[in-house]
C-alpha cells in the first residue's frame, strides 16, 4: 500500500466516523508566536483544546505537515543516519473536542489498523499509563488484546505524572494519560517491548499515540477533571507506511525511494543506500514546504533554520562530488510525489525552485574555499592525533565563509572530531561586544526612574496644557532643576509626544510656560510606559514640579503619519504582488520617508515596483477611513490582523484598519488614506541574504520628487532636441549613431595600426636570430595594440615585441612573442619587466601578455632596456 493511499484511507475512515477533514495548517504557526514550526497535528487546534476558540465541528481529522529542526524539537543531526528521524514528516491524526473519549478512540484505532490496513492483531502491542485502568480495561475486555501485550508504564522520568505515557501541554493546562500502539517486527529483529531494558531496539516500533486530555493542572500541580475531556491522536505517515510496506526503515518506503533515486540522479551516485542520499531526500521535503509556507532562507529565526537545512543538503551533495547547484532540481520530483495531496506545493513549484536555486548559488560561492580550510585543519589535527577542532577556527568559518557551526560540527563528527564550542562562543561574544561598543546608545539607557507611568494623549491631541514635570535628568543623573543651555531628559505626567517605537521616530516640539522654553529634539521611552523628552533648555529654569504646555511639531508629525500609514498599505501591496511569504523584518518611519525591510529572495522588477505603487495609490484615492480598535490579542489575530513574529504584544493590542490593510500597531497614522496624498517608491535593494529594502516617500515630498523628475526629463529632451514623449526614441537614435561612429573609429584605428605596423617593423633589431622591437604607438587603445602586435609577429616571423600607449597618465602595455622564441622569452615575463619600471604589473600567456602602469615618464627608459633583457635570455 503506497503512502498516498495510506493517507487517503486514514482521512476517509475518520470521515466515515463523523469527523470533518481539516486541511493541514501552515508550518508557520498562526496562533502561537512562541513556536518555531508546527510540529504536531494538535498545534492548529491548541486554542480549541484550551477553550479559547470554538469550531463548527466537534470531531476532526488531518494529515498535518510537520517540521522538527530547531529549538526543543530538533532531529536534524540524526536525519539520514537512523531509520526514523526526519526534519519533515506527516502526522495523521483524529481529534475529539468534548465529543467521544477513550472508548471510541481506542476502538477506532483498532478498527483502522486491523480491518482497513489489515495488520495482524497478534503483531500489535499497547501501552497505558500505569493507573489508567479505564484504558486498560477497554483494550483487554472490549478489544481483546491479551494481557501479556498490554504494558503499564509508570512515572519513568523522575516525578509524578512525568511519564512517556502522560501528556502535558505545558506546566499548567490540559493534560492526561496516553496509550501507545506498537508493531512487533518479530524475533529476527533485535529489541524488547516498551518498558524493557531492550526497548530502544527496532523490533517494537511505536506507530500511534492516543492522548486522552481529561485533567487540568493548576500552578500548584493540582489535577481537576475537565468537564469535556478531549482526544488528540497522532500517527506518523512514514512509520505506518514502513510497516505496511514490510520494510524496517522509513527511507525504504515508496515516497522516499523515488526521492532517493532522484537525488542519486542529480549527484551521479549509484549506491541508493548511501546515507547522504537519504539526507538530501529528507531535506528537499522540509525546505520545499517551508518555502511554500512563506519562510525564506535568512540569518535568524525560521529563515536561519531553513538555511541550515538547505546547506546541509548541499554539503552532502558536495561530499558525493556534486560541485554545482543540484538541490533545486529535486522540487519537480517532490511535486510528482506529493503535489496531488498538497496542491499548494504544485502551485508554488516555480517560486520554491527559484528560492532554492538562488540559495545554492550563494552558498557554492563560498563552500569550496571554506571546505578546503576545514579539510586542511582536520588533516593537520589528525596528523597530530587531536580530536578537538579549535573553536576560533570554527568561528572564522562561520564569520568569514558563512558556515553555520552545526555544518562544521557535522563534518567533524564524521571524522570522530568534536568542536571546541566554548571557544566558539567566546569568539562570538567578543564580536558582539565589539559591535555594541561601536554602536551609539540612546540617553534613556540607564536612567533610574521609579515614579508613575506617563499618560499618552498623542493619538487625539497635538498639545497638552497642564503637563507636570515629574523627573529631570542631566547626563544620566537625576536632578531637581535644569538651567538654560543645558541638555536634559524631561519626564512628564501627561504628554502628546510619541516616543520612538515600532520603527516610527519620536516626536519633536516644545515644552514651555511663561518663563521657560525647552526644545524637544527627540522622544524616547525611559521604560515601557514612561516617556522621556530629550532636548535643550533654551530659556529660563525648569524644575521638577513645574507645569508646562507640551506641544509637538504638528507638521512633522503629519508627514511622519503619512509615511507610517503608507508603510501599512505598502506591506499589504507587497504581499499581494510578491506572495504571502513577504514579512516585515524592520522599518524606519520618519518625516522624510519610510524605509521597509522584508523577506524576499530576489530584487523587485520594475513591473513589480509599478504594481505596488499602483495598488497603494488606488488605496490613497479611495480615501478610506483609518479605524482603530483596542481588543484582546487573540481576537485581533483571529480577525486577520497581522502580527509580527518575535514582537512582544500585551493582552490588549491596538488594531489599525486602513483601507485593505489590518495590522497591530501602536504608531500614529492619518485619519483617511487620502491624507497620504501621493505614494512613490524611490529606492529598492538588498540588505542581507533573503532581505530586501524599499524606500518610499509620500505627500509633498513625493510631489516635489515627481516634479524634479519631470524637470530632468524635459532638460534631457531639450538637450537631444526632442519632445519629452519622443525621448526614448531619440536616445535610441543617438545610441545607434554612437555605435556606427565607434565602428568607423575602430576601422580607422585598425587601418592606422596596419600602416604604423609597417613603419615599426623597420625599427626592429635582430638579436640572436630574433627581431626585438619596443616602441610607443601614439593614440592607440588596447585593442589596437593587440592587433598591431599580431601583424608585426606575422611580418617579422621570429620576434619579441613590446608596444606601449599613454593615455591620461596611464600606460598600456602589450607584449607578443612568436612560437619559436617563446621557449626562452616569455611574453608574460617580458611585459612585467617593462611594467615594473613604470609603476605597474601584468601577465598573460607565453605568446601574448598585457600590463599597465601609472608612471609614463619612465616609459622611454623601460622600453630602451628591452633589447638587453631579451638578449640575456637567448
From Swiss-Prot:
Keywords: Aminoacyl-tRNA synthetase, ATP-binding, Cytoplasm, Ligase, Metal-binding, Nucleotide-binding, Protein biosynthesis, RNA-binding, tRNA-binding, Zinc. One of its GO terms (cellular component) is cytosol. One of its GO terms (molecular function) is ATP binding. It holds the Pfam family tRNA-synt_2c. InterPro entries: aa-tRNA-synth_II/BPL/LPL, Ala-tRNA-lgiase_IIc, Ala-tRNA-ligase_IIc_anticod-bd, Ala-tRNA-synth_IIc_core, Ala-tRNA-synth_IIc_N, Ala-tRNA_ligase, Ala_tRNA_ligase_euk/bac, DHHA1_dom. It is found in: Cytoplasm. One of its GO terms (biological process) is negative regulation of DNA-templated transcription. Binds 1 zinc ion per subunit. Belongs to the class-II aminoacyl-tRNA synthetase family. Consists of three domains; the N-terminal catalytic domain, the editing domain and the C-terminal C-Ala domain. The editing domain removes incorrectly charged amino acids, while the C-Ala domain, along with tRNA(Ala), serves as a bridge to cooperatively bring together the editing and aminoacylation centers thus stimulating deacylation of misacylated tRNAs. NCBIfam families: alaS (TIGR00344). This is Alanine--tRNA ligase. The gene is alaS.
Amino acid at each position: 500500500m503506497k503512502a498516498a493511499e495510506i493517507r487517503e484511507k486514514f482521512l476517509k475512515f475518520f470521515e466515515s466516523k463523523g469527523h470533518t477533514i481539516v486541511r493541514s495548517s501552515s508550518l508557520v504557526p498562526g496562533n502561537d508566536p512562541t513556536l518555531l514550526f508546527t510540529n504536531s497535528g494538535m498545534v492548529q487546534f491548541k486554542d480549541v483544546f484550551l477553550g479559547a476558540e470554538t469550531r463548527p465541528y466537534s470531531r476532526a481529522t488531518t494529515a498535518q505537515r510537520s517540521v522538527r529542526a530547531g529549538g526543543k524539537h530538533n532531529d536534524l543531526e540524526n536525519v539520514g543516519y537512523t531509520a526514523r528521524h526526519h526534519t519533515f514528516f506527516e502526522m495523521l491524526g483524529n481529534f475529539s473536542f468534548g465529543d467521544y473519549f477513550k472508548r471510541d478512540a481506542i476502538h477506532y484505532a483498532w478498527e483502522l489498523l486491523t480491518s482497513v490496513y489489515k495488520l495482524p492483531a497478534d503483531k500489535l502491542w499497547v501501552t497505558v499509563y500505569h493507573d489508567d485502568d479505564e484504558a486498560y480495561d477497554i483494550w483487554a475486555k472490549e478489544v481483546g488484546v491479551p494481557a501479556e501485550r498490554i504494558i503499564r508504564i509508570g512515572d519513568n522520568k523522575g516525578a509524578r505524572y512525568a511519564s512517556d505515557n502522560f501528556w502535558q501541554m505545558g506546566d499548567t493546562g490540559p493534560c492526561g494519560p496516553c496509550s501507545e500502539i506498537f508493531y512487533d517486527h518479530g524475533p529476527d529483529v533485535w529489541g524488547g517491548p516498551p518498558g524493557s531494558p531492550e526497548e530502544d531496539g527496532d523490533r517494537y516500533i511505536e506507530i500511534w499515540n492516543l492522548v486522552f486530555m481529561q485533567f487540568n493542572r493548576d500552578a500548584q500541580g493540582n489535577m481537576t477533571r475537565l468537564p469535556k475531556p478531549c482526544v488528540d491522536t497522532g500517527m506518523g505517515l512514514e512509520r505506518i507506511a514502513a510497516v505496511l510496506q514490510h520494510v524496517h526503515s522509513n527511507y525504504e518506503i515508496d515516497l522516499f525511494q523515488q526521492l532517493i533515486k532522484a537525488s542519486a540522479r542529480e549527484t551521479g551516485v549509484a549506491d541508493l543506500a548511501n546515507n547522504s542520499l537519504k539526507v538530501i531526500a529528507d531535506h528537499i521535503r522540509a525546505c520545499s514546504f517551508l518555502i511554500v509556507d512563506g519562510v525564506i532562507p535568512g540569518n535568524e529565526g525560521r529563515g536561519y533554520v531553513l538555511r541550515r537545512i538547505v546547506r546541509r543538503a548541499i554539503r552532502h551533495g558536495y561530499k558525493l562530488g556534486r560541485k554545482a547547484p543540484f538541490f533545486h532540481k529535486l522540487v519537480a520530483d517532490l511535486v510528482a510525489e506529493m503535489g496531488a495531496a498538497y496542491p499548494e506545493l504544485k502551485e508554488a513549484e516555480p517560486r520554491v525552485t527559484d528560492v532554492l536555486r538562488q540559495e545554492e548559488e550563494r552558498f557554492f560561492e563560498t563552500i569550496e574555499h571554506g571546505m578546503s580550510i576545514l579539510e586542511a585543519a582536520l588533516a593537520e589535527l589528525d596528523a597530530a592525533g587531536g580530536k578537538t577542532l579549535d573553536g576560533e577556527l570554527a568561528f572564522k568559518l562561520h564569520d568569514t565563509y558563512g558556515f553555520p557551526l552545526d555544518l562544521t560540527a557535522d563534518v567533524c563528527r564524521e571524522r570522530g572530531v568534536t568542536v571546541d564550542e566554548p571557544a566558539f562562543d567566546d569568539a562570538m561574544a567578543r564580536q558582539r561586544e565589539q559591535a555594541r561598543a561601536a554602536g551609539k546608545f540612546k540617553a534613556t539607557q540607564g536612567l533610574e526612574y521609579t515614579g508613575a507611568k506617563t499618560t499618552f494623549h498623542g493619538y487625539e491631541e497635538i498639545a497638552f496644557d497642564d503637563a507636570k514635570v515629574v523627573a529631570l535628568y542631566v547626563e544620566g543623573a537625576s536632578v531637581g532643576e535644569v538651567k538654560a543651555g543645558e541638555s536634559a531628559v524631561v519626564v512628564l505626567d501627561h504628554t502628546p509626544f510619541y516616543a520612538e517605537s515600532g520603527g516610527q521616530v519620536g516626536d519633536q516640539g516644545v515644552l514651555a510656560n511663561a518663563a521657560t522654553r525647552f526644545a524637544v529634539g527627540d522622544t524616547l521611552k525611559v521604560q515601557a510606559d514612561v516617556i522621556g523628552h530629550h532636548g535643550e533648555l533654551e530659556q529660563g529654569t525648569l524644575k521638577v514640579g513645574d507645569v508646562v504646555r507640551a506641544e509637538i511639531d504638528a507638521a512633522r508629525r503629519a508627514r511622519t503619519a503619512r509615511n507610517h500609514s503608507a508603510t501599512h498599505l505598502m506591506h499589504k501591496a507587497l504581499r499581494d504582488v510578491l506572495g504571502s511569504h513577504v514579512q516585515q523584518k524592520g522599518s524606519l518611519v520618519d518625516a522624510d520617508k519610510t524605509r521597509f525591510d522584508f523577506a524576499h529572495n530576489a530584487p523587485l522588477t520594475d513591473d513589480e515596483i509599478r504594481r505596488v505603487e499602483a495598488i497603494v495609490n488606488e488605496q490613497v484615492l479611495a480615501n478610506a477611513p483609518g479605524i482603530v480598535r483596542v481588543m484582546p490579542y487573540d481576537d485581533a489575530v483571529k480577525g486577520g490582523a497581522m502580527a509580527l513574529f518575535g514582537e512582544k504584544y500585551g493582552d490588549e493590542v491596538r488594531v489599525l484598519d486602513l483601507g485593505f490593510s489590518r495590522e497591530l500597531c501602536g504608531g500614529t497614522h492619518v485619519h483617511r488614506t487620502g491624507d497620504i496624498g501621493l505614494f512613490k517608491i524611490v529606492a529598492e535593494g538588498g540588505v542581507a541574504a533573503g532581505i530586501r529594502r524599499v524606500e518610499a516617500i509620500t505627500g509633498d515630498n513625493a510631489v516635489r520628487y515627481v516634479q524634479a523628475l519631470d524637470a530632468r526629463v524635459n532638460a534631457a529632451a531639450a538637450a537631444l532636441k526632442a519632445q519629452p514623449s519622443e525621448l526614448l526614441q531619440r536616445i535610441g537614435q543617438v545610441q545607434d549613431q554612437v555605435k556606427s561612429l565607434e565602428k568607423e573609429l575602430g576601422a580607422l584605428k585598425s587601418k592606422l595600426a596596419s600602416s604604423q605596423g609597417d613603419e615599426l617593423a623597420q625599427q626592429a633589431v635582430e638579436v640572436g636570430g630574433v627581431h626585438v622591437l619596443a616602441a610607443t604607438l601614439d593614440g592607440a587603445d588596447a585593442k589596437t595594440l593587440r592587433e598591431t602586435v599580431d601583424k608585426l609577429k606575422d611580418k617579422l616571423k621570429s620576434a619579441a615585441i613590446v608596444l606601449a600607449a599613454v593615455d591620461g597618465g596611464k600606460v598600456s602595455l602589450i607584449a607578443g612573442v612568436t612560437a619559436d622564441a617563446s621557449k626562452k622569452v616569455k611574453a608574460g615575463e617580458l611585459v612585467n619587466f617593462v611594467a615594473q619600471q613604470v609603476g605597474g604589473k601584468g601577465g598573460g600567456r607565453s605568446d601574448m601578455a598585457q600590463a599597465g602602469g601609472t608612471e609614463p615618464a619612465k616609459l622611454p627608459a623601460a622600453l630602451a632596456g628591452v633589447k638587453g633583457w631579451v638578449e640575456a635570455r637567448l
